[in-house]
Amino acid sequence: MCSSDLLSLAGGMLVLVALAGCGIKSQQQPVKDYSGEPTGVEAPASSAGGASWAAWLDDGRQFGIVLYGSSTCAPTVASISVTGDNQLKGTLSPAPGGVCTRDYVPHTTVFTTPKGVTTTSDVTITLPDGTLTIPGLQG
């Protein structure tokens, strides 16, 4: 192999390594999942009627995402990925098979706040069915 071939190969490898760092960061799994709203947190007025919402928990060390649906087929967030500065993307767990009850109740999924997320600034969470914002914590 001549030196120009080696330089081309090295340049190509560098591009591949650089592109590998451009994708979505690793996914994070929930630490807790339960029926109901988080305790000690007031639901925003926008959640009246069953709109999804999110809030800081444990002084910002965690956050909860509240989704509404059937108590027997509860909607849950399967994972969260950091996609940018204070930008998160969530994936939903697949709906279970079978018959679901016709009630409409809150269900909370809790995650550890990812490294690099600034809790004193607003955080945007994009879910398949909409976008939620957690207001920054006041110092």
Where are these regions (language model features)?
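Extracytosolic low-complexity repeat regions of secreted or lipid-anchored proteins
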Residues: 89-139
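Mature extracytoplasmic domains of secretory-pathway proteins
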Residues: 53-99
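Sec-dependent signal peptide hydrophobic core
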Residues: 7-14
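Extracellular/mature segments of secreted proteins
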Residues: 30, 80-83, 108-109
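Short, small-residue-biased leader/transition segments that mark boundaries at the very start
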Residues: 1-3
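C-terminal motif of bacterial Sec signal peptides marking the signal peptidase cleavage site
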Residues: 17-21
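Bacterial signal peptide processing site
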Residues: 23-25
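Post-signal peptide N-terminal segment of mature Sec-exported envelope proteins
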Residues: 30-50
